From Swiss-Prot:
GO terms for cellular component: membrane. It comes from Schizosaccharomyces pombe (strain 972 / ATCC 24843) (Fission yeast). Belongs to the amino acid-polyamine-organocation (APC) superfamily. This is Uncharacterized amino-acid permease C460.01c. Gene3D superfamilies: Amino acid/polyamine transporter I. One of its GO terms (biological process) is amino acid transmembrane transport. It is found in: Membrane. The keyword Coiled coil does not apply.
Amino acid sequence: MSHNNFELSPDYKDIDKKDDLNPSIVEKGYVEGVVDDVQPERKSFITKFFDDFKPAISTDEDGSALKRSLKARHMQMIAIGGAIGSGLYVGSGSSLSDGGPASIIINYTLIGIMMFFVVYALGELSVAYPVAGGFNTIATRFIDPAWGFTISWNYFINYFITFPLELTTCAITFRFWTDINSAAWISIFLVIVIIINLFGVRAYGEVEFILSTLKVIATLGFIILAIIINCGGVPTDHRGYIGGSIIKKDPFRHGFKGFCSVFTTAAFSFSGTEFIGLAAAEVDNPQKSLPHAVKQVFWRIAVFYIVSLTLIGLLISPDDPNLMGNGSTSVSPFVLAIQEANIKGLPSVFNAVIIISVVSVTNSSTYAAARTLHGMAGLGHAPKFFKYTDRLGRPLIAMVVVLLFGFFAYINEADKNGNDVSDTVFDWLLALAGLSNFFSWGSICLSHIIFRLAYKRQGRSLRDLGFVSPMGIWGSCIGLFFNILCLMAQFYVSLFPIGGKPNANDFFQGYLAACVAIVFFVGYKIYDRSHVPSLDKLDISTGLRTYENSDEEDETSSGFKHVLKKIYGAFC
């Protein structure tokens, strides 16, 4: 056979037996045989489309068939804008109404500080163990199999429910323009999410890269505009200079209860920050990509959450009837701030940005739920058939189950009789999803503490790790403390609700996630009778990626210059 028009890659050298063929060669669509007979097999689009649904041929070193297709740019944009969505743009309205502007600024700052420590701990663990299931798999090994089982299902339920919840939010957001049946909008966005998932993790990464870029640009634009509005620089705004006149009126609405109630919605706003750890099994170079992504989280918290919400507190009164849950229409406080400045056209533009953000969070929710269910199957925490992965690296069965649950969003149709069922469902799901994040984030911190203690006890050097959290164990201790504090505050608000007496409905609506977690943990303990391993016997070697002298420092730098370099390296 002539080879003038076909050059063999190094993968084909010295192959003279069918059994010697690398599985990756088969996956590329080449015919097995001796070298002289190797030729590309041409397949039609239809044939290739259906072949992609067949079981994956090769697996990663951790036994997962997920493909490492996410690049550094994907991870950085996911870290910066991946969780900017309905929690910030819409959920902040109910936070402002319940707790007032001072409460929202303080609470979002506290949750932001907590997330700063959580994400750095997560970065260290994810670079060391870039495995399927992410931090849920790590918690199973380092904390307790029963607790790993609990938070894995807890995390899955979180995003499994968030998927139809965000579809519902899409329909609510469209009420700004029209009263068209919610089912129409739900159907459109459900189809969009299904199409994105059909193209695998690379499509998810590209879509998130584009949507996150748009969200970042829009939020920065709003910050600039909000400063101008507050200073009285908008000709159509007859209020003139606003300054701190609004925030002084009712800074802590509903007192201490209102202050505590903001924790749940703040947590929901920050949900998704941990995606960079969950995606570690699908990143092409975890040691390079993940540390950069982790460092971007600080800027997202500082700029996009703290600054934007501070400006919202300066511009919107907590008793405004148009805030989420107060009036007949639900308007984002971001859109409301532009409306009250009498700027024509721009509110519709920003409302479109909110819809883009909701689509992004919806897409991310399906990703998180499907990958978590796939990871649980690998640990034996879920039926084995959920581990099925096709040739595109899609956890196909897990993905289909999650997408099917999206049809639950059609419960909005029950509102035809004026029952307000969709609003009730939104409240219940928001409370469940928001509280469950504390369990996941607390587990990340606790896993990091145990990992560091075991790592030191077994005589290993941190210099061999690909990324070391500059916050160390103490940073994780602070993060864990904040998570426990948030759970206590939410328990108080659930037991003694704002403007009412203790009742079962409010308590379970606010603390249902804790009840579910207790049932799962006790149930697994009874079934498996798992135990907590000692630090000496804890398995930290399996799946651990070490890098010789990965944390080697420049010996020529010293003194103040060295300190500045360390600070810069921690945030940039």
